[in-house]
């Protein structure tokens, strides 16, 4: 049996953003419970879900003892993360969207990540999940690599130094990088924070086995709510080349010229 004390994180707030996927949220929270994984507090930030999900959220808040932060209408990802982060009271934030499920190994790696961020005042983020490996990595230890970036980095996907995918960060994140822009599509919101992270010289670690530590689940009855423009996913070779050239130019321009998210 797992030792409960080993999986207790009193200095970490679990922040979960939610929209119309209460079954997925319940699955996530049950998974942490099954792993004997507990936090200093749990914040669930809802983005104006349908009434049936709000009713379920209120039931779940009693079962799992979390602070439910709501809004009267859908305001987008930026507002949802901002108001959730504003409700956090602990020193560190584990940010996860509701459609993820941690593996049995997750608590021990979260413990490692917490140790790293506690002992390195310059470390801003530890990432646990991605669709593919960050292009610029150097060895840190057996399980983690250090992300790095410089002005001569030629890969356009260098901007994903930051990602909205599951990560541990300091709860003072906004002080260094600014708040998430509001009123925009989710992918644009994330993009602007990616740029801000680079502009403000963020520092982060990346979990090497990123596809297996925590998995994303989107059942048919609760599909992903993130929609991206079709041309960005077009398999046509010419379209891909045009897209890559466009991204290389735009991303580098934005790193240099985009207005800072910091007020």
Predicted regions and their residues:
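Short aromatic/hydrophobic "clamp" motif used to bind/position activated sugar donors
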Residues: 93
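Short, acidic, metal-binding catalytic loop of nucleotide-sugar glycosyltransferases
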Residues: 30-39
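Conserved donor-nucleotide/metal-binding helix-loop-beta segment in metal-dependent transferases, i.e.
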Residues: 105-125
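Glycine-rich, basic loop-to-helix element that forms the pyrophosphate-binding segment
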Residues: 28, 72-87
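N-proximal low-complexity "stem/linker" segments adjacent to membrane-targeting elements
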Residues: 1-30
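A short, conserved alpha-helix in the catalytic core of glycosyltransferases
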Residues: 110-111, 173-178, 185-209
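A conserved acidic beta->alpha catalytic loop
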Residues: 46-55
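Conserved donor nucleotide-binding strand/loop of the catalytic core
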Residues: 59-76
């Amino acid at each position: 049996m797992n030792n409960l004390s080993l999986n207790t994180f009193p200095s970490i707030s679990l922040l979960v953003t939610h929209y119309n996927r209460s079954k997925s949220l319940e699955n996530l929270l049950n998974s942490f419970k099954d792993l004997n994984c507990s936090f200093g507090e749990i914040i669930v930030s809802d983005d104006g879900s349908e009434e049936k999900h709000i009713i379920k959220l209120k039931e779940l808040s009693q079962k799992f003892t979390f602070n439910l932060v709501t809004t009267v209408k859908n305001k987008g990802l930026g507002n949802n993360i901002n108001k959730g982060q504003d409700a956090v009271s602990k020193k560190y934030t584990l940010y996860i969207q509701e459609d993820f499920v941690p593996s049995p190994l997750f608590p021990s790696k979260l413990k490692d990540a917490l140790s790293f961020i506690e002992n390195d005042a310059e470390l801003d983020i530890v990432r646990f999940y991605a669709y593919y490996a960050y292009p610029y990595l150097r060895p840190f230890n057996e399980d983690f690599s250090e992300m790095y970036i410089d002005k001569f980095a030629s890969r356009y996907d260098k901007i994903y130094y930051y990602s909205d995918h599951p990560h541990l960060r300091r709860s003072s994140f906004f002080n260094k990088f600014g708040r998430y822009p509001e009123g925009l599509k989710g992918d644009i919101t994330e993009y602007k924070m990616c740029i801000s992270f680079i502009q403000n010289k963020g520092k982060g670690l990346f979990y090497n086995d990123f596809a297996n530590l925590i998995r994303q689940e989107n059942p048919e009855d609760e599909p992903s709510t993130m929609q991206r423009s079709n041309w960005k996913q077009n398999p046509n070779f010419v379209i891909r080349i045009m897209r890559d050239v466009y991204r290389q130019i735009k991303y580098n321009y934005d790193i240099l010229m985009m207005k800072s998210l910091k007020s």
